[in-house]
Amino acid sequence: EHPDQPVLAFDMVRYVGEPVAIVAANHPEVAKKAIDAIYVDYEQLDPLVNSREAIEAAPIHPDGNVIRHLVINHGDPDAVGNITVEGEYEVGMQDQAFLGTESGIAFPSTDGGVDLHISTQWLHSDRDQVASALNLPEDLVRVTLAGVGGAFGGREDVSMHVHLCMLALHTGRPVKMVYDRNESFLGHVHRHPAKIWFRHSADDS
């Protein structure tokens, strides 16, 4: 729900898989040929491959490279028990690997809105984000849950939602979109990696 994903990358592409263009066609092969005709001139940046580098590097996001830094104290942080354990722990990026592929279909409506049928965990949040991205009133964006197909947190973020609706509104025709596994792995939001520092104190009991 933090608006840090542009609908299409502009000025800067931040990762392999970030959308830079969308194409609609009446056959997948025609769409592939159209995609192959798109040329993008990239200036390669030095990659940021860990969080510490990203904190110190020049920002690649409008609000900086750190989305959230949390300090959590539970109990008295200055208390010292008979046993104290502290350390830094790291959790790597994970893909939720749900069984159902990412897919959806959007229908333009006669009232100027759009009807989106898609797998999601957050119908109302998705509607709000799509409406905001398309500059439409929320009541003109109608999102219907088309089954979940597994999620595990992986369907909390919008992926193809806005693209589907943009294409349907632009063409005036229903538009279906399906990501294959490679496209999901490259482009969809994964469970984020994290670095966590803990100090635990306890008494003998």
PLM features per residue range, with description:
Residues 99, 123-124, 148-149, 181-185:
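Short acidic loop-to-helix transition motifs that present clustered carboxylates
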Residues 1-129:
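Extended, polar/acidic
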Residues 116, 139-147, 172-182:
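Beta-strand segments within the central parallel beta-sheet cores of soluble alpha/beta enzyme folds
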Residues 104-108, 128-140, 163-177, 200:
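Proline/glycine-anchored alpha-helix kink/cap motifs
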Residues 46-55, 138-148:
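A generic structural motif
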